[in-house]
Amino acid sequence: MYQSIPQQGNYIYNGNNNFFPQQQPQQQQYLNNSNNNNNNNNNNNNNNNNINNNNNNFQQSYNNGNNNNYNNNNGYQQQTSSYDMYGNNVNINNNNNNNVNINSQNNVNNNNNNNNNNNNGNINNNMLMATSSALNNIVKVTNGYQQQQQQQLLQQTTQQQLQQQQQLLQQQQQQIQQQQAALQLQLEQQQQQKMVLMFGDEPMGYLPFSEDKNLMLLSALNTNVDGGSFYGIQQQQQQQQLQQQQLQQQQQLQQQQQQLQQQQIQQQQIQQQQQQQQQQISPIQESASPYYSTPIQSNTMLSIPSSPGIPSSIPQLNNSNNINNNSNNNNNNNNNNNNNNINYNSNMASNFISQHSNNGSNTSSPVPQTTYLQNSGGNFNAYNGSNTNSPITPSSYLQPTTSQDQVIPQQLSPNHDQNQQIIQQQQKILQQQQQQQLLLQQQIQQQQQQQLHQPQSPQLPQSPQQSPQQSPQQLQPQQSPQQPQQQPQQQPQQLQQTQQKTVQRPPIIQPTTIQPQSPQPPQQPQQKQPTINSSITPIQPIQQMIQQLTQNSSTKSTSKASNIPATTAACPKVDLLPNKSPISSYILPHDFEETLAHLSEKQKTRRRASQNLASRNYRQRKKQYVNEVEDRLDDIVQENERLKKELYDSKKILKKLLHENNILKSGGQLPNKSDIPGCTGSEDEDEDDFDQFDQQQQDGSADPSTPVVETEPDISVLVDRLQVDMSITTQDDLTTTLKQFYSTLKNRQDLYINQIKQIVNPCTQAKLALLDGEISPAQSCPFEDPSEKQHSDPNSSPIGDMPSPYEQLEPTKWWSNFCNEANINPEQENRVRQLRQESNLRHKKIIKERTHLNREIREYYHSKVFNGTVNNGGNTKSKKTAASTSTTTTTTSTSTTTTTTTTISTDVDISNNISSPVQSHLVQLSGLLDKLKENIDHENETLIQTYEKLGFILSPFQEALFITKIYNNIFSESSYSNIQMLHGIKDAILYSYVDPTYT
């Protein structure tokens, strides 16, 4: 808005918006250059703020600023007051700070003197002497030269933008190469990955409801296919995924080509518009060139000071003009181009528009500042204010000068050459992108030749992937062409606020118009600018394609959820990925609730069934896997126990050898061997060692390297626990106690069998043969093969080899009571009867075979060993020889005995004294002892298997009740050990039913 100069006193302006009082009146200087005699000099006083109008015609003035003051001088003077934007009351007499004296004369030359310090202009216009053609030429020429200047600046900015685009393109090409390399690595890794099943020695995998749910549920729909076929189907699925990805890539390439064609069409349209604009500018320049000459740059002009109440940032009219009229037909018109404003001064129809200003409320930056003046003698005085925003328009040929704060206007038309360069660069960039697309197509074709061997099946359409977020460098050049490009310099924030609050401006009134027009807002032409950064847009689909490839390749086995049949129940090993494709969410989508609302009842039922199948199959595989792990753990424990036992035996032998070595070093003699044939004298030491080891285990002073026997709970404790579990705890706890009870009996039975096997050795059997007393008649008979002789078993039971059918068995009294108490059903009774018959038959065979083996072993000792000793009773040497020979042969031929031969008599030659019949007899003895050990093992297996089968027949509660009854009722008269308890269970089963044929 305009500011008023103080009215009282004279002031001097120092150029810093400050006034200083002056004692002497300021001398005013005017540029008066006239060539005619009839000059009318009108001097305007600094303190005079009045407008003298000699004509009573209608005068209209429109000032730049927020306060619009209209003065109608029809023979009187009007004073107006208004408020500025900061609330200061400003009294304005007609036209503040721009005082104009208008003297209308006919055929008289007017000399207008303008005071530079106070911005007062005296303009004498001649009526009907203003020419509209001159004004139009001035406006067009000034606009044309401003456009040339703006185009030069545009070229610089476009070059910078093109350089930035090239850098961005290089970065994007590098990113594309890196992403392509990553995609190839992922594809190779996926091809090499195999389906990890839980069969055999491979791991079991993960839970079915993990990130990749689709394949897990599909695998549960068919449990009849093995893991190998599932792996083959998975390979087919991966190949079909690759096919789908390649088709998507081809579609994306086609879309990119279409976009490129559209961009080329847009560029052609831009070229046509630029040619039209250039054709419009060229005739204006040619028509205006003969009227004007080259201007001369002048010094700067001081700006009009601003009042203290109004900030200095508000644009004001700070330039003053001294215009000298040299002819009768000259009319001085001021055109303000700084803010795209044109001031028309004419006397036609007595309408005068003093000034028309447009601060460019739709613009974002000021325009170049130019001022030019011309005198009558051909000399030019140009004033370019250093702090001005409204320069004076030129009255001659213009060549604008720009300051450092100048910026490019928003709406402009670039040169044809510059546009061609931009188009060429864009075409080069498009060619590079096409080459990249060709490379991608070649890679896709190579992958198809290597991997695709089967026709593609229909798939569900994938939803478009979201484009990756662009970096700020990419987002900045990709602005909408409708929005103006941001210039390097911006207006102050206060200036933008004042521009937004300005009132509507009246349109420009041409000199040919007669009636005044109503105020209307200025309409700027919608000129379409070329999109300089349009070359970056084709790269976006490439980035989207690369992102889709990465997401699709990372989601393994998630395609064809609706068309692929159920394969197998094997649980594969899946990768936990953050991204999911739409196909993987067909059965279990990411937004479960929303998808559930759109599914039909049939689909919901199918999904629930597949989930149940997957859960059940997983539990089965998990149980199988746990059993395999437990079996392996048992094998490892047994191997560890065996190694501990071997270490213990080796240490014992080493200790014995060291003891004998110390005896021999000290000069002593080794202890004599036993006189009993087959005995070495070390058996007693072994028994003593075993007793000593047992005592150390109980005291806790055993050697840490020796094998430790784990202490197990007593049988009475387990029976009491079973009684409590039957009444209080659940079935699972009862089953756990039964398993512990079974393992305790089994371990104790194994230990008992190992101790029995120690008796089966030549020395112990010789002692047992001597204890028999009476020798049977078979001792004197020659040795015969036992298979040729048929011996009758004196201890045979009355039950024959062919037992009666189990249906004919009658239950005993106690078994009937137990069946009633335990609620045994008829099917269980039949199975118990079958078990009783089978175990009874096997037990009878084992006992019969053992009796036969014992008789043969004793007959062997009486006929072969003891008989030779009696016959050679007088010869001690032969006795020792026979004893030593028999001892050596028996201990070396028997592999299961724990005795070892220490020494052999040095005066006996084994090769000379042992004949072939004797050697055959020793082999026979070792075979008999081995058979006896096998018989003991068979009996142990029969007892354990009988108890196991009973557990399968009875329920946990019935089994616990059966054990407690045996322990409390049947064997309550005496305390039974764990081994006797196992035999008691067998006997209870054996005597549960009675065969009526043998009663």
UniProtKB/Swiss-Prot annotation:
Residue ranges, compositional bias (Polar residues): 286-302, 348-406
All residue ranges annotated as the bZIP domain in the record: 601-664
Start-end of Acidic residues biased regions: 682-692
Positions of the UniProt region annotated as Leucine-zipper: 636-643
GO biological process: negative regulation of asexual reproduction; regulation of gene expression
Gene Ontology CC terms: cytoplasmic vesicle; nucleus
Superkingdom of this protein's organism: Eukaryota
Keyword tags: Coiled coil, DNA-binding, Nucleus, Transcription, Transcription regulation
Disulfide bridge positions per record: none
Database matches in PROSITE patterns: BZIP
SUPFAM superfamilies registered for this protein in UniProt: Leucine zipper domain (SSF57959)
Coiled coil: 148-198, 232-282, 423-451, 921-950
Subcellular location: Nucleus
One MF annotation (Gene Ontology) recorded for this entry: DNA-binding transcription factor activity
Region (Basic motif): 602-632
Bias (Low complexity): 1-79, 88-126, 303-347, 450-517
CDD domains assigned to the protein according to its UniProt record, in alphabetical order: bZIP
Region span, Disordered: 1-126, 286-406, 450-533, 601-620, 665-711, 779-807, 870-899
Primary location group: nucleus
Function: Probable transcriptional regulator.
Family as reported in the entry's similarity comment: Belongs to the bZIP family.
Protein name per UniProt: Probable basic-leucine zipper transcription factor N
